[in-house]
Design a protein with these regions (language model features):
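Long, domain-scale functional regions
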Residues: 1-287
Length: 287
């Protein structure tokens, strides 16, 4: 079944789609998207879903724009960032300053420049938060800097023991991790373009969990990247970020330099611009 549920985000009450939803299709910029949620400010968050409409449960590489590493390097805590700071840093703040673009951010920005920038579709996009939650797990003493072993919040999922991370959050815990273009009240203002990735919180709320699930609308039959850091392991100096496994399981993670991770960009449409359609695959919402 499909559901519309409610949770708080940085802007108010957000209504998110969960499960086998069949009325959240959008056609925009000649591509198909799925509505993930109505943000607290009324804007509409959508995720890329292909050049044609795909049914829930359908496995297709068309449901992503391509494949990319999250970061081409992996040997420092900094590389769990959608943007990152200094490698070899002695402080958390220096490692996680939003100075350098990640590999996946550059990939997504290039897609935006090729498909959205300079077109009439730009005017329909809104600025809203994309969360790259680099907060440290409450069971961990790691510093998040250099090559120190560090468990980030999503090292523990709600399916694991200890109740370290039993609440999904649509409010990004740290403003430095709340990626926006111009909103510096709620976000960091670090983005050039209003496009990003889904967090693991959003994926779990949509129906991803710790077991295979091909029935919810985010299933693609491919491994694809989330924006949520997992951990940095000092043996081998390896940075890991969460993703969604090919069976739909949101428990997936990969070394950040894994170059075969699928990329599914996300952006936010301005409130009330989807004036046509009923949201079905055959009659998607449209401008």
């Amino acid at each position: 079944n499909g559901y519309l549920c409610k949770a708080k985000d940085a802007y108010g009450d957000s209504y998110y789609y969960r499960g086998n939803v069949t009325n959240n299709y959008v056609k925009f910029a000649d591509k198909y998207w799925r509505i993930v949620r109505i943000n607290g400010d009324g804007t509409v968050r959508v995720i890329y879903d292909g050049t044609s409409a795909h049914a829930n449960g359908e496995s297709s590489s068309d449901r992503q724009i391509g494949k990319s590493a999250f970061n081409s390097s992996y040997n420092d805590n900094a590389y769990v960032g959608y943007m990152y700071g200094a490698t070899g840093a002695s402080t958390y703040a220096a490692a996680h300053a939003n100075t350098n673009d990640s590999t996946i951010k550059a990939y997504i920005d290039n897609w935006y420049k090729a498909n959205i920038l300079g077109t009439a579709n730009e005017e329909y996009l809104a600025d809203n938060i994309f969360c790259n939650d680099r907060s440290i797990s409450n069971d961990n003493t790691g510093t998040g800097a250099g090559t120190t072993r560090t468990n980030y919040r999503w090292y523990w999922g709600p399916w694991e023991s200890g109740n370290h991370n039993d609440n999904m959050k649509l409010i990004c815990p740290q403003q430095n991790d709340a990626f926006t273009v111009s909103d510096t009240t709620n976000g960091n203002g670090a983005l050039t373009y209003p496009i990003g990735l889904l967090s693991t919180d959003e994926i779990v709320l949509a129906g991803g969990w710790s077991k295979e699930n091909s029935g919810y609308y985010l299933y693609s039959g491919q491994y694809w990247w989330a924006s949520s850091p997992d951990y940095f392991y000092f043996v081998g100096y390896n940075a890991f970020v969460r993703g969604v496994d090919s069976d739909g399981d949101a428990h997936g993670h990969s070394l950040v330099n894994y170059s075969s991770g699928g990329v599914r960009p996300v952006f936010n449409l301005k409130a009330e611009v989807l004036a046509q359609g009923t949201g079905t695959a055959s009659d998607p919402y449209r401008i």
